[in-house]
C-alpha cells in the first residue's frame, strides 16, 4: 500500500506511527510506503554526534532511532518511509539499502536526471557538480527491528537548502546538498513521490517474488 500522510507532517508523530506499525505487524502484514513532506526539522540518527549540529537556530532537533548522522527535512522534499518485511523479501540490510538507492536512481532517470550516482562508502544519491564535487540529493536512513524495516529516504525536490548550512550533512563537513530544481529538473513533490514509491514497490515486490520462488524450489 502506498499512502500520502497529511502535510506538513510532524516528524515525531510519524516516527511514533512507524514504530507502532512495526511493533504490531506480523508475518502476514502487508508492506506499506508512506509519503510525506515534513515541517522543518533536523533529525539525528543513532550514530549522530552533537558536533555536527553547527547552528540549528530555531529549527527543532529530534534524536531518532534510524541509522546515520544528522540531516534536515523540510517543505519541498519528499520522504518515502518504507515499512518492509525484509525476511519475506530475503534481503539483508546492505542489500536493502542497495535496493533503496537503485530505486532512487531509477526515479531520477525517469525525471531526466541521468547523471545522478552513488558514492562508495557514503550511502545516498549524489549529483556531480562542475569541478567534480559530488552534491547530495537524496539521504537514506533505516532501522530494522525483528526483520521489519522502517524509516527510509528523503529526496530533495525544490526546497530552501539553506538549513543544510546549519549542520554537517550526514556527518560530512562541507558536504554540499542540491535539489532537482537546482539541477534543472522541474517537477512537483507529488509527482516525484509517486514515481519514487512506484519504483520502491516494484523493486521490493520483485525481491518478495524471487524469495517465494526460491522457497518453493521454482527456478528463477
Swiss-Prot record:
Localisation per UniProt entry: Cytoplasm
Site residues (Lowers pKa of active site Cys), renumbered to this chain: 136
InterPro entries: aa-tRNA-synth_II/BPL/LPL, BPL_LPL_catalytic, Octanoyltransferase, Octanoyltransferase_CS
Catalytic residues, chain numbering: 170
Annotated transmembrane regions: none
A cellular-component GO term for this protein: cytoplasm
Ranges of residues in domain BPL/LPL catalytic: 27-208
GO molecular function: lipoyl(octanoyl) transferase activity
Pathway annotation from the record: Protein modification; protein lipoylation via endogenous pathway; protein N(6)-(lipoyl)lysine from octanoyl-[acyl-carrier-protein]: step 1/2
GO biological process: protein modification process
Reactions that this protein is recorded to catalyse: octanoyl-[ACP] + L-lysyl-[protein] = N(6)-octanoyl-L-lysyl-[protein] + holo-[ACP] + H(+)
Signal peptide extent: none
Positions contributing to substrate binding: 66-73, 139-141, 152-154
Additional record remark: In the reaction, the free carboxyl group of octanoic acid is attached via an amide linkage to the epsilon-amino group of a specific lysine residue of lipoyl domains of lipoate-dependent enzymes.
Function: Catalyzes the transfer of endogenously produced octanoic acid from octanoyl-acyl-carrier-protein onto the lipoyl domains of lipoate-dependent enzymes. Lipoyl-ACP can also act as a substrate although octanoyl-ACP is likely to be the physiological substrate.
Protein family according to the UniProt entry: Belongs to the LipB family.
Name under which the protein is recorded: Octanoyltransferase
Organism annotation: Bordetella bronchiseptica (strain ATCC BAA-588 / NCTC 13252 / RB50) (Alcaligenes bronchisepticus)
Amino acid at each position: 500500500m502506498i499512502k500520502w500522510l497529511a502535510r506538513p507532517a510532524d516528524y515525531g508523530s510519524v516516527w511514533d506511527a512507524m514504530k507502532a506499525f512495526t511493533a504490531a505487524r506480523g508475518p502476514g502484514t502487508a508492506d506499506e510506503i508512506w509519503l510525506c513532506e515534513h515541517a522543518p526539522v533536523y533529525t539525528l540518527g543513532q550514530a549522530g554526534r552533537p558536533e555536527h549540529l553547527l547552528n540549528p537556530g530555531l529549527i527543532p532537533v529530534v534524536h531518532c532511532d534510524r541509522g546515520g548522522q544528522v540531516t534536515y527535512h523540510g517543505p519541498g522534499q519528499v520522504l518515502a518511509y518504507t515499512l518492509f518485511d525484509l525476511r519475506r523479501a530475503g534481503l539483508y540490510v546492505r542489500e536493502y539499502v542497495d535496493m533503496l538507492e537503485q530505486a532512487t536512481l531509477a526515479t531520477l532517470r525517469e525525471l531526466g536526471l541521468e547523471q545522478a550516482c552513488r558514492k562508495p562508502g557514503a550511502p545516498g544519491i549524489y549529483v556531480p557538480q562542475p569541478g567534480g564535487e559530488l552534491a547530495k540529493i537524496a539521504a537514506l536512513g533505516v532501522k530494522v527491528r525483528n526483520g521489519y524495516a522502517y524509516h527510509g529516504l528523503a529526496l530533495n525536490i525544490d526546497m530552501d537548502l539553506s538549513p543544510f548550512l546549519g549542520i554537517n550533512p550526514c556527518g560530512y563537513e562541507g558536504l554540499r546538498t542540491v535539489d532537482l530544481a537546482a539541477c534543472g529538473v522541474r517537477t512537483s513533490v507529488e509527482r516525484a513521490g509517486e514515481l519514487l514509491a512506484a519504483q520502491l514497490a516494484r523493486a521490493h515486490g520483485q525481491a518478495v517474488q524471487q524469495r517465494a520462488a526460491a522457497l518453493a524450489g521454482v527456478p528463477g
